[in-house]
A protein has these predicted regions:
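Short, solvent-exposed secondary-structure capping/transition elements
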Residues: 56-57, 99-103, 116, 186-192
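Pre-Walker A-like glycine/lysine-rich segment at the N-terminus of P-loop NTPase domains
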Residues: 2-53, 178
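Short glycine-/polar-rich loops that comprise or flank the Walker A/P-loop
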Residues: 2, 84-89, 116-120, 149-152, ...
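Beta-strand secondary-structure signal
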Residues: 5-7, 88-92, 105-107
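Conserved P-loop NTP-binding catalytic core
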Residues: 31-34, 45-102
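Conserved NTP-handling cores and scaffolds of large molecular machines
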Residues: 48, 52-56, 146-150, 181-189, ...
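Glycine-rich phosphate-binding loops of NTPases
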Residues: 61-72, 99-153, 163-177
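Extended, Lys/Glu-rich alpha-helical coiled-coil stalks
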Residues: 158-206
Length: 206
């Protein structure tokens, strides 16, 4: 998987359309994003994660009132005063399976309604919009190849990477990301469940 393009529209300090072409090759495959404090580096990374994973990035299993409250502070402040202004993040991905190269565009958009914000999420494959079922399948596939915890190994900012690795939860973060990447998180959960079952069985026999 390769990220080719990122587009931010009215998110944080980004006003109107901002396009980042980060298409790389084998010789030049690391992209550095620089800027002064407050220029929008953290917003840039947070927007990419939100586009790919949605509310899960913000700690929610499904979009709800609290999620949209946080998103209201994430989008550009102009949306508070003009109901016609929208905000979105769009990410273009390239997948090469060895036989064919496919291009996916993920578009996550927020717009105002009377009670706050509403979200719209679209996925296009090679220029054609996917239906709801195909979009869910692709989102699940994306979660399987790069879980949100693993995202920090590929996209990180200098202010948070030290906390991710060296903070109080650093070891757990690394362990969880590794298990999810290799599909071992289910096995680990099974081992823990068996251990608890054996412990209960031992206690009941006593």
């Amino acid at each position: 998987m390769k990220i080719r393009r990122i587009e931010l529209f009215n998110l944080g300090p980004y006003i109107d359309k901002n396009i980042f072409d980060i298409n790389c090759n084998r010789e030049r495959h690391i992209v550095l994003i620089g800027g002064k404090n407050g220029a929008g580096k953290t917003t840039f990374f947070k927007a990419i994660k939100t586009c790919l994973y949605g509310c899960k990035v913000w700690g929610f299993e499904a979009p709800g009132k609290e999620y949209f409250r946080q998103m209201a502070s994430f989008v550009n402040s102009r949306m508070q005063f003009d109901s016609h202004i929208k905000a979105y993040v769009e990410v273009e991905l390239e997948f090469d399976d060895g036989k064919q190269i496919n291009y996916f565009v993920l578009h996550r958009e927020w717009y105002r309604i009377k009670k706050g914000l509403e979200e719209k999420f679209l996925i296009c494959k090679n220029g054609c919009e996917l239906d709801r079922e195909s979009s869910i399948d692709f989102s699940n596939y994306l979660l399987s190849i790069i879980p949100p915890d693993m995202f920090n190994f590929y996209f990180f900012d200098g202010e948070s990477i030290a906390d991710f690795f060296l903070g109080s939860d650093g070891s757990r973060n690394f362990r969880n990301a590794f298990l999810k990447l290799y599909g071992l998180d289910t096995l680990s959960l099974m081992v823990e469940n068996f251990a608890r079952a054996l412990k209960r069985s031992g206690n009941s026999s006593n």
